[in-house]
Amino acid sequence: MIDAIARVRRFNRAVTTEVGALDTSFLGRDRPLGAARVLNLIGHGQGDVAAIRATLDLDSGLMSRLLRGLEEEGLVATDPHPDDARRRIARLTQAGRREFKAYERLSDAQATTILGRCVRRDDVLAAMDLLATVLGQARITVEETDPRGPAARHCLG
């Protein structure tokens, strides 16, 4: 069992190093990965702040700090939700759309570089697919929920 644990930890270290997860300037854009992930979700149409928080499994304090930082940079603006003023909807500003596109280009380039170093590319991609599926399944729960709530909206896209 210790060997399995050591292998998982080795894998975790390799991935976090490879993708720059611990860099203070993720992909050289002067913000950490957490803020970049929030920007990414908003850029892909996930504006409900509670749903973003649920998707990234962030506590409310960290979510607020990340969102406030993006707002202070002029990349994101928030508005009250039209159906519930206690909730907020985030959207990219014009500068935020440019930054989102820059991250998309840099992320694609990073993926291209990683794949370019792989001799057994198809095997690596199959392993990545398997891991993404297995790790995603581990987060699935079956429970009754408000169909208008952030968890339901996240599942229904």
Name the predicted role of every residue range.
Residues 8, 101, 105-150:
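Terminal interaction helix/tail motif
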Residues 2-5, 9, 57, 97, ...:
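Short amphipathic alpha-helical segments with heptad-repeat character
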Residues 52, 75, 147-155:
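Short, solvent-exposed linear motifs at loop/edge-of-secondary-structure regions
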Residues 21-62, 67, 73-75:
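N-terminal helix-turn-helix DNA-binding core of bacterial DNA-binding proteins
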Residues 55, 87, 137-139:
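Short, solvent-exposed beta-strand edge segments and adjacent coil->beta transition regions
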Residues 1-33, 142, 150-156:
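N-terminal leader segment of winged-helix/HTH proteins
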Residues 68-125:
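Charged, amphipathic alpha-helical coiled-coil/dimerization segments
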